[in-house]
Amino acid sequence: MGSKLGFTFGVLFASLLLISRASAEENGKWLDVQLPHDSPVLLVGFNMSPTTVTVRRSSMLLDLHETLVLRNVGNQPICGLTLRVEAQDLTPYGKGSVIKPSLFVLPGEEFPVKVDMQLIRPISATKSESAMVQVTLDCALFSNLTAYGPDKLNSRRTLMVYEKEARRDRQYLAHLLDTGQLPELREELNFGIQDVAPRQLGLELLRGPRTAAVREQALAVNPMPFPKAAVQPLRGAAQVAGNEVRAPRVEVRNISKMRVASVAMGWVVRDDRGDDFVAGAVTSPVVIGPVQTSSISESGTLRFSRSTGQPMVIDKLMAFVNDVQFSDGTLWIPSRADIDAATQDPELRREL
């Protein structure tokens, strides 16, 4: 009986796999890159590495590996790009994105964009006449910090933060070179440092209910202020269990004369060994008037993990303002002087 079931399942699996592949071929291709007629980039070609389909119940798992070659057909240098990649848009597992920050692609130049991700597509969707995966342009950022695209993923803000940080760091390195501060320049570029791996920590934002009850403890969130930050963290609190932080809340004050539209709070985690890690930032839409105070809270759970996968225990939490977007669309990011004043730890400075 078991062998018959196994044989039947194997035949069904092979049939579904052939159907999905045949569908992709009959309907044109695996991939369809859809760019508007006035798009600043043009698809020149793509190289598809081994891409596989695995049937899982009523869905297909698409393991995508490909490289798109795009050309800048606009009249301005492109400094960043975000593509939307969708197998179906009904669930979060059927769509993703690829971001290429800190570029400098002149008009007429070509550049590669790698797409490496897994997406889920319903088997019933193979009857559609469209390709199995659709790629569209979400946002292109130009050198003058204007942008093109629907920006459904809020990509413009992300690309602008990357670009402003890159310009800040390039300006600082150029200053070190111009003033002959070669030892400092070598340290910034990690020249002469043997086998030094940066301290990395992963950050996940979980919004679903917890699967099991865990013992939590209250933990204060200590502010790490930048001297000239437009928004200053004042105090905060959270519930902590192991490597998870639930419902963190930080009180902040807008000390500028501009209205704030969103704030990205960065997190520094100290583990039970006394090591500090910069664990990323979470952007929150929050309107704060000039010289006003507000609270930034997260209803979900922040889960921190080591890059090695080893368990960790959170001993201390610190919060800093990673960037601020004002109502007119402009952005504030910390200067190098702000970062130097925030901490004396050289590794933490480098990560900030």
Regions picked out by a protein language model, each given a short descriptive name:
Residues 19-24:
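Sec/Tat signal peptide C-region and signal peptidase I cleavage site
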Residues 1-7:
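Positively charged n-region of N-terminal signal peptides that target proteins for export
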Residues 73-93, 138, 257-275:
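Short acidic, flexible loop segments centered on an aromatic residue
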Residues 123-144, 305-327:
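Short, surface-exposed ligand- or partner-binding patches at beta-edge/loop junctions that are enriched
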Residues 94-95, 145-154, 276-278, 329-338:
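Beta-sandwich strand segments
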Residues 25-67, 73, 90, 157-251, ...:
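Low-complexity, acidic Ser/Thr/Pro/Gly-rich terminal tails and inter-domain linkers that flank the onset
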Residues 91-127, 273-311:
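Intrinsically disordered, low-complexity Pro/Gly/Ser/Thr-rich segments with frequent PxxP/GP/PP motifs
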Residues 8-18:
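Bacterial N-terminal signal peptides
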